[in-house]
């Protein structure tokens, strides 16, 4: 009999560890979906207006980095940050293929970001999940709890994973 259970990630406060374990579960599903893809199918778009699978993978990392580093940890975005491979990766859908990024490269970028996220979460307590983080976005002040941010990151990655799986079917890559 198969049994799936979610356990808290070791070294993190219990509830924080459950969120991180859920993030890791979705990441493993994403990794399995793209790890064996060649550069061409990873980088090309399935149809006009679509994003490439590789760009979506890096966008997942960009979102996690922005939420965790800039909002949770309070990092101020620099010009150097904006040179990262994942930054604004969805802005020019047709430009991604020319970069020649491999699946291994894209997943390694995600691993770096995930390690940074884990580093932020290590020192947090159960009570920190209710901490309200206030920031400006698109000229509007926003409040989000850390619990909501972690949930959002799981949901965001899961949605894009589904999009990636759909694109693979459209491109006959299954």
Predicted features along the sequence, with ranges:
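Short, contiguous alpha-helical
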Residues: 2-9, 20-24, 28-31, 40-91, ...
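Hydrophobic alpha-helical core bundles mediating ligand binding, dimerization, or RNAP-core interactions
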Residues: 23, 27-30, 34, 110, ...
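Contiguous N-terminal and early-domain "leader" segments and peripheral loops that mark the onset or edge
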Residues: 1-2, 115
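Short Lys/Arg-rich basic patches
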Residues: 15-19
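Acidic/histidine-rich alpha-helical segments that form the ligand environment
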Residues: 89-131, 148-156
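Conserved catalytic core of Hanks-type protein kinase domains
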Residues: 36, 59-60, 123
């Amino acid at each position: 009999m198969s049994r799936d259970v979610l356990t808290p990630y070791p070294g993190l406060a219990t509830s924080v560890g459950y969120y991180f374990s859920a993030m890791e579960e979705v990441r493993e599903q994403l990794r399995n979906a793209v790890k064996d893809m060649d550069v061409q199918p990873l980088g090309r778009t399935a149809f006009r207006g679509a994003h490439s699978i590789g760009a979506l993978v890096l966008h997942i990392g960009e979102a996690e980095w922005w939420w965790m580093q800039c909002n949770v940890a309070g990092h101020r975005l620099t010009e150097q940050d904006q040179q990262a491979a994942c930054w604004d990766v969805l802005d020019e859908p047709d430009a991604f293929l020319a970069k020649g990024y491999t699946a291994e490269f894209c997943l390694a970028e995600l691993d770096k970001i995930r390690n940074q996220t884990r580093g932020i979460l290590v020192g947090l307590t159960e009570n920190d999940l209710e901490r309200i983080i206030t920031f400006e976005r698109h000229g509007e002040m926003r409040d989000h709890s850390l619990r909501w941010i972690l949930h959002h990151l799981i949901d965001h990655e899961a949605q894009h994973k589904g999009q990636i799986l759909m694109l693979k079917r459209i491109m006959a890559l299954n």
